[in-house]
Amino acid sequence: FLCPIAVGSDTGGSIRMPSSFCGVTGFKPSFNKLSTSGVFPLSWSLDTIGPIAKTAKDCSIFVEEICKHQIANKNKDPFNGLTTSMLDNFVNLLSPNLKIGVPSDDFFSDVEEEVKKEFFKSIELMKSMGAEIIEVDLAWLLMARPVNVVITLAEAFSLHKHWLESDSKKYTFEVISRLVLGENISLNDYFSSM
């Protein structure tokens, strides 16, 4: 590994997808868990920062330390401060009362066998620790990407409109062609997507 941890921003998968392609762990914390202060925005309602690291434990340590720093600096912490290990908290939650939803086999039709095997291995581990595993229907997930695109494009255009008009030379043609798509998204479509 070139470095033990990297920090990225994730609006629609920019941490999670590259991580999964490279066999490392990418973690997108809950929205507003970590401050995005100093991050150049793309979508104010979806932008999140998070770690890319070798393991979930490494990601947990990163988030834990950032939360401690935010609390020490009196930044608003909507989750009352995470000062103990996220993984320890998760393990403590595993009980007969905890239910974990797992999609049906159809959901995994495009997933490589090795990835699928590791996923189900982790599910079996959680089951052995007391969690109840239930099958869930994630057909609605097919709408997630189009909804994300509407929100991201509308907010990105709104955020970048001033610079596109005043200093478009700082943008590549490819970026401009994506951003201007947001100009045609109606307020109704935007609010319906929220």
Predicted segments with their positions:
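Flexible, acidic loop-helix segments that line cofactor/substrate-binding pockets
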Residues: 74-83, 97-99, 103-106, 136-148, ...
